[in-house]
């Protein structure tokens, strides 16, 4: 997917949010504005996409604005709706389907991958998925490398993109000592939580 936020149609985002808010029985207990008022504010935020660059004003004409906190919420609502529609209408549901923002991993039979990919892309004219197939060393998802063992179990390892610099906070830098210790603890925690025991 090129950029998730700029691919989300504002009208679709507002439509999905409207249905969710109008069907939310406890909205009045959590906030004083009505569903209609929240939708009006949402529409105002999503359509206020003007910005100044080198002395000229521009307006984004499609999609939600990158960097806007409401764009993250709307992108997740739209993607959830799209995924629910796609999985409920596809003949063979994926055995595994996980998404974090715009990074998705799915497990299907190899023969079903092109069909499911097309089915996902048919859900919306603007939101398009790309496919990365399992390579001999596995497939990456977020910061994990996932491999299928001969017995069908999944083995996970820590994954770093080829652009990863391997640069961390230098111990002899003038940073607080607790920050330096947290770098080591975070790396250790990541390894123990992500990696499948050998």
Where are these regions (language model features)?
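Charged structural interfaces that engage phosphate-rich ligands
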Residues: 1-198
